[in-house]
Regions:
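Chitinase-like catalytic core of GlcNAc-active glycosidases
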Residues: 144-382, 397-417, 428-431, 444-456
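Residues that scaffold, gate, or flank divalent-cation-dependent active/transport sites
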Residues: 438
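Short mixed-charge
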Residues: 384-394
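Tryptophan-rich substrate-binding surfaces of secreted polymer-degrading and adhesive proteins
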Residues: 3-9, 24-136
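Feature captures outer-membrane beta-barrel proteins of Gram-negative bacteria and organelles
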Residues: 423-424
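Bacterial N-terminal signal peptides
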Residues: 11-21
Length: 459
């Protein structure tokens, strides 16, 4: 994920620089309607492919922005400051000074898992057709049983529903069908399909056409992939495929249209990779409107799916361990939601994105992405329990599946096979597994991530 996206998502190959996040600034972010002018003299224009450290400023479309997290917007991804509020805060309209902003190049980006934070990644394109979002039957009536939570170690990868080779993002391998035998052949046993289109009213569409030749798997193909050993989840969100969490009507429409897709296509679970629009109230014991509506969505989906239907989450670090720095706005916004579903047993595992931003320990300590030290501090914090305003949020090791970039270029904070091995072996098999953005990125550079993790897991 993840911005993956995501993840959630496509990021440039440069490692993100270490930098402390600026939570206080986040809470005071200016809105697009701000009328006071600010000086932009000497401030560089925002550009893709440049690493912006936390706290740095840039101008874009006549406005001044400040980076909330260190980030490197990938070329062609469309991660402009106004499109990525998890990464930038708007300080106001420029008074006339500053450098004109370049026009972002256009290509189909990859999210997470975005990886944002992932900063998650894949804008939702305007569908070329408008099929019914609630089909009532599968071609040929093909169905297959729901798979339970995997009992052993997992290697979870995001499957891209677009062509990353055709758009030049990872030329070595573009779109592949979900039934491609190389996926399980290189160690992946959980696949997260990214991402459906979400319309402004909450309607969810799972359809062909993200790029020429790209097709979503049929129900029969989903069953074929599952028979080959895969557990398959549908990922919701990413950096740009957001949902209006301020509206309960939108939340209800989302549930009403995603449940038929989950059933028709034989998905085993849902992955929550919401990277925009979720904020905390400042009081961890009082849900904000957006938090309440995300819970409304999750509960609505789980209530209509069979018992044992899976739930995973792939938030960026700011939304989870960032709560050790401060609680409010995006900082720690996932914490009440994670706690709810860990405590009630419904969360299969947490896929926090250990990339595209700082990693945090329980004391507000900050570490650069891509370091074993940061990986360990953050993982231990969740297992021990992060205490925020007297409330403890604990995610035990066996419910942690940390997310890492599959290859250099897939996300900031890439860890090579040796560092991944050091991080994994710290826990002597105690972690449930690892997640990566993305399967397609891994395949584009020889599948080294999957092969390494499979060996580490002894599979």
């Amino acid at each position: 994920m993840r911005l993956r996206r995501g993840s959630t998502a496509l990021l440039s190959g440069a490692l993100l620089l270490a930098g402390a996040a600026l939570p206080a600034t986040t809470g005071a972010a200016a809105t697009a309607g701000t009328t006071a002018l600010v000086s932009c003299a000497g401030v560089p224009a925002w550009a893709e492919g440049v690493t912006w450290t936390a706290g740095s400023k840039a101008t874009y479309a006549g406005r001044l922005y400040q980076a909330l997290q260190t980030n490197t917007p990938p070329v062609g991804a469309g991660w402009t400051p106004p499109a990525t509020p998890a990464l930038w805060t708007d300080l106001g309209a420029c008074d006339g000074g500053g450098t004109p902003s370049p026009t972002p190049t256009t290509s189909t980006p990859s999210p997470t898992p975005s990886p944002t934070r992932s900063p998650s990644p894949t804008p939702s394109p305007t569908p070329t057709s408008s099929p019914s979002p609630t089909p009532t039957s599968s071609p040929g009536g093909t169905t297959c049983p729901l798979k339970p939570r995997p009992s052993g170690k997992v290697l979870q990868g995001y499957w891209e529903n677009w062509d990353g080779a055709a758009n030049g993002v990872h030329p070595g391998l573009g779109w592949i069908p979900i039934t491609d035998p190389r996926i399980p052949g290189h160690g992946y046993n959980v696949v997260t399909a990214a991402f459906p289109v979400i319309r402004s009213d909450g309607t969810v569409l799972w359809e062909d056409g993200m790029d020429a030749g790209v097709k979503v798997p049929t129900p029969a193909e989903m069953c074929q992939a599952k028979a080959a050993g895969l557990t398959v989840l549908l990922s919701i969100g990413g950096a740009a495929a957001g949902i209006d969490l301020g509206s309960s009507a939108v939340a209800d429409r989302f549930v009403a249209t995603v449940v038929p897709i989950l059933k028709r296509y034989n998905f085993d679970g849902i992955d929550i990779d919401i990277e925009t629009g979720l904020t905390g109230s400042g009081n961890i014991n009082q849900l904000s409107t957006s938090q309440a509506n995300l819970i409304r969505i999750i509960d609505g989906v789980l209530a209509q799916m069979p018992a044992g239907f899976g739930l995973t989450m792939a938030p960026e670090t700011a939304y989870v361990t960032g709560g050790s720095v401060t609680y409010g706005s995006i900082w720690g916004a996932y914490l009440p939601i994670v706690k709810r579903y860990v405590d009630n047993g419904r969360l299969w595992w947490l896929n926090m994105q250990y990339y595209n931003g700082s990693m945090y320990g329980c004391a507000g300590d900050s570490y650069a992405a891509g370091t074993v030290q940061g990986f360990v501090a953050q993982t231990n914090c969740l297992n021990t329990g992060l205490v925020v305003q007297g409330t403890t949020i604990r995610v035990p090791y066996d419910r942690q599946v940390p997310g890492l970039p599959a290859q250099s270029g897939a996300g900031g904070g890439y860890m090579g096979p040796s560092l991944v091995g050091q991080a994994w072996n710290t826990y002597q098999g105690g972690l449930k597994g690892l997640m990566t953005w993305s399967i397609n990125w891994d395949g584009s550079k020889g599948w080294t991530f999957g092969d390494n993790v499979r060996a580490l897991q002894g599979r």
